[in-house]
Design a protein with these regions (language model features):
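Alpha-helical transmembrane segments and their immediate juxtamembrane cytosolic regions
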Residues: 1-347
Length: 347
């Protein structure tokens, strides 16, 4: 399948934003809360946009197994030794059996968090969420009411997410992410199925990027103001147009960048799973090192101009592993074998 350059740009920028947002920064800074709240919708929209019907449940599940299930298992297993070291450094002793099993149980429960378990590799929550969305779409396709069912589920997810923001009944992390992001996934799916959003026009795309990003920022500022004013319903309702405008603002911006074909961006896009699965380890190591070198008591808090080069450094450290994975171990980037990149050029 021929790669879509503007989608590679979107995935690469989104995954670098994920790394940036996992570097501790003050919640008082608007840009940080904005990116924290909105970045993940890019992945869900693109996942829906690229969703294909492979003709049979067997072929669909083969794709899900290699692209979502196995990477979820691998990257959870890979970070468990890191979790043990982190526990030892923070408590001064190795965990007992109960605490040692806690993150493993959390991973089995899709990065669940409660008094008995905790997420082992929290950033991976979106993989089971996307898997569930794919399965829902596949099931709905077998009926003649697929779009009515999906629209109904999106409406239900909105009300569940709204209720959960008030009563906090849904477990973290995957169920909340599923309720929150299903509408954006379905929107992407519709755009992909009906071949929408494919034309490239530099001037129109630049105007679209500026307009949608401006509206997104305004909606998000209003969304935060509603929260501080205890306007619960308005706070939730405004979150959706902020996200939708963000999606189109970012994607129009990536269409502007479509004229620039960068092999590094392509490889980062292909290696999204590597970065999502392993960056949290590097974030912790860098935070720990800087805190001790600078004798910082408590948790370090970066400014944006400090966090940005660190995020780029983390991606750069993982980049050789991405290249190796593409060439030698495709399962780490969610691929079955070598044939998928025969027509790709690696740099």
């Amino acid at each position: 399948m021929q790669r879509i350059n503007w989608i590679d740009w979107a995935k690469a920028l989104a995954v670098m934003s994920v790394v940036f947002c996992h570097l501790p920064q003050s919640q008082e800074w608007f840009y940080y809360r904005y990116l924290q709240a909105l970045t993940m919708v890019i992945f869900f929209f693109i996942s829906g946009y690229l969703k294909k019907d492979r003709g049979s449940d067997k072929e669909n599940w083969k794709k899900y197994w290699y692209g979502l299930v196995i990477p979820y298992i691998i990257y959870n297993v890979a970070v468990y030794p890191y979790w043990l070291v982190k526990y030892y450094l923070s408590s001064g002793a190795m965990p007992d059996l109960f605490h040692a099993l806690s993150p493993l149980l959390g991973a089995l429960l899709l990065e669940h968090e409660n008094e008995f378990c905790e997420p082992l590799n929290g950033p991976l929550w979106y993989l089971p969420a996307i898997l569930i969305m794919h399965i829902i779409i596949d099931m709905c396709r077998k009926t003649k009411y697929q779009h009515w069912i999906m629209i109904s589920l999106c409406i239900i997810s909105f009300f569940l997410y709204t209720a959960n923001k008030y009563w906090y009944f849904a477990p973290n992390l995957t169920p909340i992410g599923l309720m929150r992001n299903l509408p954006y996934y379905y929107m992407g799916y519709l755009f992909g199925q009906y071949h929408l959003f494919r034309n490239i026009d530099f001037k129109q795309d630049a105007i679209g990027c500026f307009a949608f990003m401006t509206f997104s920022i305004l909606f998000f500022a209003w969304h935060l103001n509603a929260f501080y004013s205890d306007q619960h319903i308005l706070h939730i309702v405004l979150f959706y147009p902020a996200n939708i405008c963000f999606i189109f603002g970012v994607l129009y911006g990536c269409k502007v960048l479509n004229r620039f074909k960068s092999p590094m961006i392509t490889n980062i896009s292909i290696g999204t799973l590597v970065i999502v699965g392993l960056h949290i380890v590097l974030v912790t190591i860098i935070n720990f090192s800087i805190e001790h070198l600078l004798h910082i008591s408590g948790t370090i808090c970066y400014k944006w101009y400090e966090a940005l080069p660190i995020a780029i450094l983390i991606v750069a450290i993982l980049y050789p592993l991405i290249i190796w994975s593409i060439k030698q171990c495709p399962i780490l980037v969610g691929k079955e074998g070598y044939s998928w990149y025969k027509k790709e050029t690696l740099y």
